[in-house]
Amino acid sequence: MKYFLLLLFFILAPRVVDAEVTVVINSEKFVFLGNPRLTDVLTPVAQKRHWYWPSSALFRLDGVNAEQQRREVLTSLVIIEQESDVALANSVQHLKQQVQAWQLADRVEQTIDFDLARLDPNFNPRFEDGHYLLLLKERPTTIEVFGLTANPTTLSQQHKMCLARQLHKTYSELENKDLIYLIQADSTITTSGIAYWNKNCGDVMPGSQIYLPFFESQFSDTNRKLNYAIARLAKNRVIQ
């Protein structure tokens, strides 16, 4: 009877299921039992190539936030398109098509750097249960440009890029002639002045994105909020 009760206990007792973390590193899949640290995930690939760590990006493949943000942005764009003149409506249509075509996943705000993670425990967190995509790249040579334009393009990345000169040369008509949004490769969002009188040149991280935004009025923050929402959404782009 005692053995029967023990057997019954083991059958009915809740089972502890080992945590499982799946990480696709570029195109190679790794499965970890338990919750690995960043160094555990990077060790199999860290020395394979000369990775440019600042442009590395970690995404959750089982997240839903990015797609929700996309729906909200597209809804706002439809409203603006309906209320705009023909020229702006056409530009909005092009932006909608760009946003609809993006491959998105929820970006994890985490610095990816193998050497830093080995030296500083604060940069070597454990992965929560789930499915991830980790993109590692050698040093990119281009900057992606998207936004209110029929011609999204790429610019060659250079030291001390003079964005005002390059963008006005590439795009004769800009909805916002004063500033652009810069989504750095490390997911930091900033604005940069591009007025004709702006002669400032600065460093743009390889693999960054430039968003050509709506005009922003000092009397209303509607466009500013939408511009930031689009830039924030672009952080979640999966750019192979």
Please give the residue ranges for each predicted region.
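Sec-dependent N-terminal signal peptides
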Residues: 4-12
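Ser/Thr/Pro/Gly-biased, low-complexity, turn-/loop-rich segments
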Residues: 17-240
